[in-house]
């Protein structure tokens, strides 16, 4: 299962200007906010969560919320993601991989997932 999302960094900057910290809290967990120190990073996190929901085939909504997807970094700074136990079990997900990049005012994320084998 694969999901991809592209977002304008300018769009995220406008979102932050309008909604501030409260807006960030709607889609980022507290530990993610600590990592998201630049608009580029925030845009990448937004794209990652959207790409993850697309890989699951749901989009963000009742089945999968922004806070069901936890983003963090490995010791070298590469992005990683973890699904909530509820979502992981419901969709029978075994593993997830994430890649995020930024270029010319855009952030893009790709998520690949493998289902558990019977």
Curated annotation (Swiss-Prot):
Keywords assigned by UniProt, alphabetized: Cytoplasm, Fatty acid biosynthesis, Fatty acid metabolism, Lipid biosynthesis, Lipid metabolism, Magnesium, Metal-binding, Transferase
Enzyme Commission number(s): 2.7.8.7
SUPFAM superfamilies with a match to the protein in the record: 4'-phosphopantetheinyl transferase
Keyword Metal-binding tagged: yes
A GO cellular component entry from the record: cytoplasm
Catalytically driven reaction(s): apo-[ACP] + CoA = holo-[ACP] + adenosine 3',5'-bisphosphate + H(+)
UniProt xrefs under Pfam families: ACPS
Cofactor: Mg(2+)
GO MF entry, a single one: holo-[acyl-carrier-protein] synthase activity
Gene3D superfamilies: 4'-phosphopantetheinyl transferase domain
Subcellular location field: Cytoplasm
InterPro entries for this protein: 4-PPantetheinyl_Trfase_dom (IPR008278), 4-PPantetheinyl_Trfase_dom_sf (IPR037143), ACPS (IPR002582), Ppantetheine-prot_Trfase_dom (IPR004568)
A biological process term (GO) from this entry: fatty acid biosynthetic process
Binding site for Mg(2+): 5, 50
Function: Transfers the 4'-phosphopantetheine moiety from coenzyme A to a Ser of acyl-carrier-protein.
Family: Belongs to the P-Pant transferase superfamily. AcpS family.
NCBIfam families recorded: acpS, pantethn_trn
Protein name: Holo-[acyl-carrier-protein] synthase
Source species: Wolinella succinogenes (strain ATCC 29543 / DSM 1740 / CCUG 13145 / JCM 31913 / LMG 7466 / NCTC 11488 / FDC 602W)
Gene: acpS
């Amino acid at each position: 299962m694969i999901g991809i999302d592209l977002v304008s960094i300018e769009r995220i900057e406008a979102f932050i200007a309008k909604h501030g910290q409260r807006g960030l809290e709607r889609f980022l967990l507290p530990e993610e906010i600590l990592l998201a120190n630049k608009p580029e990073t925030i845009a990448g996190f937004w794209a990652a969560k959207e790409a993850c929901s697309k890989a699951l085939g749901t989009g963000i909504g009742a089945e999968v919320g922004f806070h069901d997807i936890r983003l963090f970094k490995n010791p070298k700074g590469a992005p990683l993601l973890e699904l909530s136990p509820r979502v992981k079990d419901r969709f029978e997900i075994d593993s997830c991989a994430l890649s995020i990049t930024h270029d010319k005012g855009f952030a893009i994320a790709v998520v690949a997932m493998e289902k558990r084998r019977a």
